[in-house]
């Protein structure tokens, strides 16, 4: 089995959905505002809601094909589903919840109980009941239960939405380990930009039941920024040096360097950085005697003026997209136009620490 392929049309009551995308592996984030159709699409993949036509497959394993009359029931789809709430059996210990999944999976195990427990850091919880666990612990157990059913695909439906910020930060590293070590394709539903920036390898944007864009996270993420103050772009690079005196890591972005305040990075690490448009300024030339360390040569590729005081300037940095949110007055004062060669100024501290990921 390999990646997920979806090409379907259907309805959930009066709500119509039309979706087509392919996900090769890792984490595919379904992103959109509330009511965009994320959970409806997930239910169609899981088999709890039937599309009207189209096809859904994981590699060469067909889950649904309207033309061929194939519509596997949920229990035959080899899918692990994690809900917004953990839905653990309250009368069972954590260990029994996990071993139940092994029994219910009906497939030959490819990963051991101990491996899954170690992966999610839940060994110390095995004898406890769900009612004694924190929200983050319950979700880790729920993910473990899904993984022990030996799925070909994991569906995570806003698994962190019921948790506060502290609990989210507690569980995110375990989801990253799941992504990097389990080798199970994951479809991750979220409307939280921070989670998508940190976890996603691919992004599928949904709006009013339709896929508006899909592709690699670095390519699609700037489209989110166009609609959100909190968005930005994703840049990937390698830690090329570390300054012990000033506690700054230098990231090689392929011909240009980027300095980042100490975040526990080590030399040769592959990392992903998130740069918000609101933290990018523009200069006509490299300024002298300036405290900002990250100066990137860029080309203006577009200017979008809103009705308010702000404008969004689209930039190209060595084939990668950047954005800057400026006032319209600043755009006019600088005389910016498409094709201009300018300098993007990014504060080192403006890079989202939570979005740093080791590849």
From Swiss-Prot:
GO molecular function list: ABC-type molybdate transporter activity; ATP binding; ATP hydrolysis activity
Reactions performed catalytically: molybdate(out) + ATP + H2O = molybdate(in) + ADP + phosphate + H(+)
Cell compartments where the protein resides: Cell inner membrane
Cellular component terms (Gene Ontology): plasma membrane
PROSITE patterns, alphabetized: ABC_TRANSPORTER_1, ABC_TRANSPORTER_2, MODC, MOP
Family named by the database record: Belongs to the ABC transporter superfamily. Molybdate importer (TC 3.A.1.8) family.
Protein name: Molybdenum import ATP-binding protein ModC
Gene: modC
């Amino acid at each position: 089995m390999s990646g997920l392929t979806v090409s379907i049309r259907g309805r959930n009551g009066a709500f119509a959905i039309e979706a087509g995308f392919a996900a090769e592996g890792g984490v595919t984030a379904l992103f959109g505002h509330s009511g965009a159709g994320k959970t409806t699409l997930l239910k169609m993949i899981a088999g709890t809601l039937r599309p009207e036509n189209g096809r859904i497959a994981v590699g060469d394993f067909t889950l649904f094909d309207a033309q061929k009359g194939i519509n596997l029931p949920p229990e035959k789809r080899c899918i692990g589903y994690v809900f917004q709430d953990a839905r653990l059996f309250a009368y069972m210990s954590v260990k029994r919840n996990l071993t139940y999944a092994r029994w219910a999976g009906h497939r030959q195990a490819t990963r051991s109980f101990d491996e899954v427990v170690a992966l999610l850091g839940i060994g110390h919880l095995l004898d406890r009941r769900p009612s004694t666990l924190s929200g983050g612990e319950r979700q880790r157990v729920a993910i473990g239960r899904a993984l022990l059913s030996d799925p070909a695909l994991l569906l995570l439906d806003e698994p962190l939405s019921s948790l506060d910020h502290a609990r989210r930060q507690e569980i995110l590293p375990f989801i990253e380990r799941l992504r990097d070590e389990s080798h199970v394709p994951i479809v991750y539903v979220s409307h939280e930009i921070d989670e998508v920036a940190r976890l996603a390898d691919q992004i599928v944007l949904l709006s009013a039941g339709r896929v508006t864009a899909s592709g690699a996270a670095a390519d699609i993420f700037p489209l989110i920024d166009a609609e959100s103050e909190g968005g930005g772009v994703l840049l990937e690079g390698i830690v090329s040096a570390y300054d012990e005196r000033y506690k700054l890591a230098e990231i090689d972005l392929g011909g240009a360097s980027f300095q980042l305040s100490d975040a526990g990075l080590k030399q040769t690490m592959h990392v992903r950085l998130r740069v918000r448009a609101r933290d990018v300024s523009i200069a006509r030339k490299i300024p002298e005697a300036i405290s900002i360390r990250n100066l990137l040569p860029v080309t203006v590729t577009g200017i979008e003026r809103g009705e308010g005081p702000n404008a969004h300037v689209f930039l190209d940095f060595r084939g990668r997209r950047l954005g800057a949110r400026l006032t319209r007055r600043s755009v006019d004062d600088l005389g910016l136009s498409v094709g201009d060669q300018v300098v993007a100024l990014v504060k080192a501290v403006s890079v989202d620490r939570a979005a740093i990921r080791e590849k």
